[in-house]
Swiss-Prot record:
Annotated binding of chlorophyll a ChlzD2, by residue: 116
Main localization category: membrane
Oligomeric form and interacting partners: PSII is composed of 1 copy each of membrane proteins PsbA, PsbB, PsbC, PsbD, PsbE, PsbF, PsbH, PsbI, PsbJ, PsbK, PsbL, PsbM, PsbT, PsbX, PsbY, PsbZ, Psb30/Ycf12, peripheral proteins PsbO, CyanoQ (PsbQ), PsbU, PsbV and a large number of cofactors. It forms dimeric complexes.
InterPro entries documented for this protein: D1/D2, Photo_II_D1/D2_sf, Photo_RC_L/M, Photo_RC_L/M_CS, PSII_PsbD/D2
Residues annotated for pheophytin a binding in this entry: 128, 141
Domain of life: Bacteria
Bilayer-crossing regions: 39-59, 123-139, 151-164, 206-226, 277-293
Membrane topology: Multi-pass membrane protein
Name of the molecule in the record: Photosystem II D2 protein
Natural source organism: Synechococcus sp. (strain CC9605)
Gene: psbD1
Amino acid sequence: MTIAVGRAPQRGWFDVLDDWLKRDRFVFVGWSGILLLPTAYLAIGGWLTGTTFVTSWYTHGIASSYLEGCNFLTAAVSTPADAMGHSLLLLWGPEAQGDFVRWCQLGGLWAFVALHGAFALIGFMLRQFEIARLVGIRPYNAIAFSGPIAVFVSVFLMYPLGQSSWFFAPSFGVAAIFRFLLFLQGFHNWTLNPFHMMGVAGILGGALLCAIHGATVENTLFEDGEQANTFKAFEPTQEEETYSMVTANRFWSQIFGIAFSNKRWLHFFMLFVPVMGLWTSSIGIIGLALNLRAYDFVSQEIRAAEDPEFETFYTKNILLNEGLRAWMAPADQPHENFVFPEEVLPRGNAL
């Protein structure tokens, strides 16, 4: 009797690599990790290096590092000089010509952090897609994370691409972001933009929904433990519900006259509201990149100019924006050598 034993199929390098990447370990790597881990490491490392050592004297005329006396709130990795335009500012490019110190002085670290940070965020979203597929769940976490990605890409990349250079993007720092917000208000009247309004409604609405949902669940927990602390009565693998949806529905029906009766609709709504807020604000930022105007109530401006007794909150805000532009531009863009004659500077209600 003859027994034929077949040869084991040869495993290619791709299969071996796939198995290694998806191996069960403390920190999952996966195919997405090939993009996420190095880019996140370089982006964070670049930011720490810039805020610790690199000055902004040559790009913004200011100090921006711990080495120069800044603290955590005032240190930043500043945007490149306006003269750099939209150059990628590669270390080996024509601007720095391989000189690392010159590259830092020109703002090369900002481009480095921005581009690697964008790819790191995309890698993190792909990581959520990959793990969701392996675990066998739906990919709504990854879809939700597209909101922060849209905001980052629109604010840090799309907006300056629509302007004259990377210089007009936000620098990577706390006070630097605040300066950028003031800039958006003064030069674009951003708070009156309907996309900003939708973004605020989405983010604050999401926070409100989160608070309401958490409080309602805590209010309607089943009394299933003898201890004062109800947290210890919960087991992650328990089959029964931990709170009463029926009681929660009756509670909110009495308060508003209407309430969610479907947990799936409720949680989808909690996903939808903040993510739509992030998406709409990102669309608005792209509009600002193209210098699109939102609401201009010209009739009120004309009447306010003609009638000293007529004033609205809109006309007051327009005057504030003029003040921001007039006083901010010379300090924010010293390389332009702006000089505004005193007679054109705004004087409050006196117009």
